[in-house]
């Protein structure tokens, strides 16, 4: 039986980026297997954030490959993402992986899809997973109509997603990167 269900959200503002992921792991459509999973991680000397949605084993495979690309390209997020996407499209094994990654540094947010696409959102806000549309909508509304910082926006938007998506809970992992090099967890 497949383990699935999550929400990952990233928001960029003038000071940097914040990324959050919920902690719920669901088996099938009805059984919560874990409440405190950590789906957002720091990569490449704590300068890159990455979150995953989809099959857990597949996501860890992608994390490993993405981290190797970051090392290969000196932490260049966009180059590492594009090179991983090329591999993803070419490799018969990778094409079968059922996962997506949301990756960010202090300047850029990218979505890496299971079809090998690399998408940079126009507005500095991106979400993946079952609760992604809810979190994305809430984050856009908060960003447009308030002066909240990125971390507060991701926390509030994830709370909305948790209220609406049965595969998303309120146990959050939140990571931030500041443009000046600072980071918080």
UniProtKB/Swiss-Prot annotation:
Description of how activity is regulated: Allosterically activated by HslU binding.
UniProt entry keywords in alphabetical sequence: Allosteric enzyme, Cytoplasm, Hydrolase, Metal-binding, Protease, Sodium, Threonine protease
Xref: InterPro entries: ATP-dep_Prtase_HsIV_su, Ntn_hydrolases_N, Proteasome_sua/b, Proteasome_suB-type
Catalytic activity: ATP-dependent cleavage of peptide bonds with broad specificity
Residue stretches in coiled coil: none
GO cellular component, one term: proteasome core complex
GO term, biological process aspect, one: proteolysis involved in protein catabolic process
E.C. number: 3.4.25.2
UniProt-annotated catalytic positions: 6
GO terms, molecular function: metal ion binding; threonine-type endopeptidase activity
Binding of Na(+), residues: 162, 165, 168
Keyword Cytoplasm: yes
Pfam families in UniProt: Proteasome
Family matches, as PROSITE patterns: PROTEASOME_BETA_2 (PS51476)
Cellular location(s): Cytoplasm
Free-text function comment from the UniProt entry: Protease subunit of a proteasome-like degradation complex believed to be a general protein degrading machinery.
UniProt subunit comment: A double ring-shaped homohexamer of HslV is capped on each side by a ring-shaped HslU homohexamer. The assembly of the HslU/HslV complex is dependent on binding of ATP.
Family: Belongs to the peptidase T1B family. HslV subfamily.
NCBIfam families: ATP_dep_HslV, PRK05456.1
Protein name stated in the entry: ATP-dependent protease subunit HslV
Underlying gene: hslV
């Amino acid at each position: 039986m497949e383990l699935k269900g999550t929400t990952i959200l990233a928001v960029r503002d003038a000071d940097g980026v914040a990324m959050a992921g919920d902690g719920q792991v669901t088996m099938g459509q009805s059984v919560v297997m874990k409440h405190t999973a950590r789906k957002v991680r720091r990569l490449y000397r704590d300068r890159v954030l990455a979150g995953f949605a989809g099959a857990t084993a597949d996501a860890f495979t992608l994390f490993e490959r993405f981290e190797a690309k970051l090392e290969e390209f000196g932490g260049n997020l966009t180059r590492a993402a594009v090179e991983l996407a090329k591999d993803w499209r070419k490799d018969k094994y990778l094409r079968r992986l059922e996962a997506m990654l949301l990756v960010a540094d202090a300047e850029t947010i990218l979505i890496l899809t299971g079809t090998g696409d690399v998408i940079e959102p126009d507005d500095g806000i991106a979400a993946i997973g079952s609760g992604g549309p809810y979190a994305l909508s809430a984050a856009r509304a908060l960003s447009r109509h308030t002066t909240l910082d990125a971390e507060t926006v991701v926390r509030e938007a994830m709370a909305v997603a948790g209220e609406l998506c049965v595969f998303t809970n309120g146990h959050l992992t939140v990571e931030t990167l500041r443009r000046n090099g600072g980071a918080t967890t």
